[in-house]
Swiss-Prot record:
It is found in: Cell inner membrane. Residues 41-280 form the ABC transporter domain. This is Methionine import ATP-binding protein MetN 2. Its EC number is 7.4.2.11. It catalyses: L-methionine(out) + ATP + H2O = L-methionine(in) + ADP + phosphate + H(+); D-methionine(out) + ATP + H2O = D-methionine(in) + ADP + phosphate + H(+). Keywords: Amino-acid transport, ATP-binding, Cell inner membrane, Cell membrane, Membrane, Nucleotide-binding, Translocase, Transport. Gene3D superfamilies: P-loop containing nucleotide triphosphate hydrolases. The complex is composed of two ATP-binding proteins (MetN), two transmembrane proteins (MetI) and a solute-binding protein (MetQ). The gene is metN2.
Amino acid sequence: MAQLLDSPGFIERSAAVPHKAAAAPATRDAAAPAAVPGAAVSFELVGKVFDGPRGPAAALREVTLDIARGGVFGVIGRSGAGKSTLLRLVNGLERPTSGAVRVNGVDVGTLDERGLVALRRRIGMVFQHFNLLSAKTVAQNIGLPLKIAGVPKAERARKVDALLDLVGLAAKRDAYPASLSGGQKQRVGIARALVHDPALLLCDEATSALDPETTQSILALLADINRRLGLTIMLITHEMEVIRAVCDTVAVVEQGEVVETGPVWRVFGDPRHGATRALLRTLAHDLPADLAAHVRPLDGAAPLPCGAQLLLDVRYTGASGGEPDLGALTAALARNVGDAVHFVHGGLDRIQGRVQGRLVIAASLAARGAAGPDRIAAALAAARRHANRVEVLGYV
């Protein structure tokens, strides 16, 4: 218990959201040490087995992960992949069958009930469903955990007002949940999760019940809270768009295993596992079906006929870190294949300051007659100097 209370990661954030320590023993310590570098959460060969109707079922298999302090870490996967089990292990709602889950160096599995209570007061939790008490006002819903903890009324009021300002709901202080939109209800849930000044905020599908516009506003709020308060966020979702919008690092979970992890720009720009590619398919610039139906494959050493258009698949993964020079790319193709070069399909995006995406480019061969393998190979070599990957799709 003492180790947990003295852990350097559980820091006071009074500068951002004023919260004077109460004299009651249920409140947090008045002077907590500053945070130190290192993992906020670590999973060490974690396995979790549940008893199912057909016998033991493994929800997680030898998961090893480090979640850096002060970042936004996303966990994504299909339904039933094991995402929520990971999150429940962090706050001690589940115990690992094997391995260890450490929060700021403390093995959660070794804590007794009193230790778990102390842990959970330093971990905020935002749920998919808002779980607000309909008979209580917004302010009362936010202040309820403080009331249960024995925080004096005046101090509760100051804390609640500061949190209402933080989440943009100061005007809704005395409103009841029935009068709020879905986004406003989730803002109340976020404010309530912050009442004990947590160093770690867990979000379990926090935007999946919201419309796209409201989702973006909630993600912007989470990013702002991360910047202003410096707390670590662990976010569970099945939407790659959510990962792209707010996360620094992502782990892909498939059938209880972490199959891929890394910076968001790298995982999006160069996915290495089939599960990751499947999740990204909704964001990919796939060739439209009407165009794909007309694409013919290259026939070995046979030259392409005069008048054909060579289709190239050009990829930018973000690995170079610079801006793509599309003018140089098209000029290189024009010199080596044909004078008429144009973009057919695709798009570029910027993730964590890195440009990435896919472009389908057509190079007309009409101006220079038929093109054989040597000419096509020269065109590919020239194009690859200006992109991370260039492949031939075929011709039309």
